Amino acid sequence: MNVEHEIKLLIDEIKRLGVENSENKTWTVKYGVLFSDDKCANIFEALVGTLRAAKKRKIVKFDGEILLQGVHDQVDIVLLKDTL
């Protein structure tokens, strides 16, 4: 799977699992929700790598450079735009 395709899938999963903020048209999901979701586990070989690639392209934002299960479960992943 290529990076762009995985980012598109990530966008879909953030919308499926997250909450929309109608004020600024963003979606937010907790890292722990994404990480522990069975569908996401089956889609993404390296969720953190996909998140970092999306962050580099300014599609998502989150605090920190790398996210770890358990330690960062409550970190918000914010979808800034839903297109590449």
Regions found by a protein language model. Give the residues of each.
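Short alpha-helical segments that sit at the start of domains
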Residues: M1-S22
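Acidic, Ser/Thr-rich intrinsically disordered and amphipathic helical segments
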Residues: N2-L9, V29-V33, N42, A46-T50
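Charge-enriched amphipathic alpha-helical scaffolds
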Residues: F35-L67
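Generic structural hydrophobic/aromatic packing signal, biased to beta-strands
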Residues: L10, I14, V29-Y31, A54, ...
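Beta-strand elements of modular eukaryotic interaction domains
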Residues: L17-K25, T50-L51, E65-L68
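Short, cationic-aromatic polyanion-contact patches
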Residues: I66-L84
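Short acidic, hydrophobic short linear motifs in intrinsically disordered regions
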Residues: N21-D37
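Eukaryotic low-complexity, proline/serine- and acidic-rich intrinsically disordered regions
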Residues: M1-I7, A53, V60-E65, D76
